[in-house]
């Protein structure tokens, strides 16, 4: 394999839109010898991030996947990376693209990242390139907490402090770059700035150019606006409601209230 591209986020830098476009064009990309792993139905390879926890730890994703012990995590790791190895062997791609913001936001230690690299190499990956989009920490906090409000969480002023546990690990850009370059090498880091004032099409164009994909290789109509933020007025109203009621949390699954506020 000529190249393995790990797109590691950050959270709130348009990852969902990128992943959706890649997943919808998987067959088209294979014709150009570019593999987008079929493991992730949404295009988000978060399973590989969770499988790289070293050591095992419990969080919302491990609970959702019913990974309750180190032994279960080890079995999960083997299944996930064996499946990736089988995909690589079946398609013999020149390039593999793996995308998940959870690579950055969940793999916080050198041991985690080393485990990811080791497992990927055993699956047949090589020639790594780490692609990360950095964004103004305050903008990340605002977007992150806006999503939390839509899920029924009451956000207070303390949430916007950089040391708050919901965002501290995401906005510490220096630590992120130090950790990933320590494992994969400075020369393999591709650090870019999120195009803050531009539309999603600018981000998509930048991503495709960076990973070496021509737009002519894709069906660009297979795009979707994802994770649209509510207006400031709507968010404030919703946040005040969250302070007094769990109604929003209960409605979050069908998004009825969000549609009324947007």
Regions inferred by a protein language model and the residue ranges of each:
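Anion-recognition interface
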Residues: 1-262
């Amino acid at each position: 394999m000529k190249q393995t591209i790990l797109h590691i986020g950050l959270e709130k830098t348009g990852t969902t839109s990128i992943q959706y476009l890649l997943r919808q064009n998987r067959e088209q990309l294979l014709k150009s010898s570019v593999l987008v792993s079929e493991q992730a139905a949404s295009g988000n390879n978060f399973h590989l991030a969770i499988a790289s926890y070293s050591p095992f730890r419990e969080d919302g994703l491990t609970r959702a996947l019913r990974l309750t012990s180190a032994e279960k995590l080890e079995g999960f790791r083997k299944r996930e990376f064996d499946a990736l190895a089988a995909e690589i062997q079946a398609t013999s791609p020149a390039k593999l693209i793996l995308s998940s913001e959870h690579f950055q936001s969940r793999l916080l230690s050198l041991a985690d990242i080393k485990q990811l690299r080791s497992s990927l190499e055993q699956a047949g990956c090589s020639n790594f390139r780490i692609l990360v989009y950095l964004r103004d920490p305050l903008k990340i906090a605002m977007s992150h907490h806006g999503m939390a409000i839509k899920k029924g969480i009451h956000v207070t002023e303390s949430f916007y402090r950089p040391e708050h546990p919901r965002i501290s690990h995401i906005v510490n850009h220096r630590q992120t770059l130090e950790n990933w370059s320590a494992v994969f090498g400075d020369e393999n880091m591709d650090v870019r700035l999120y195009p803050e004032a531009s539309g999603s099409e600018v981000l998509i164009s930048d991503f495709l150019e960076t990973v070496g994909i021509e737009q002519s290789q894709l069906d660009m109509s297979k795009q979707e606006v994802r994770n649209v933020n509510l207006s400031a007025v709507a968010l404030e109203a919703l946040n005040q409601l969250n302070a007094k009621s769990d109604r929003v949390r209960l409605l979050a699954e069908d998004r009825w209230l969000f549609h009324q506020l947007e």
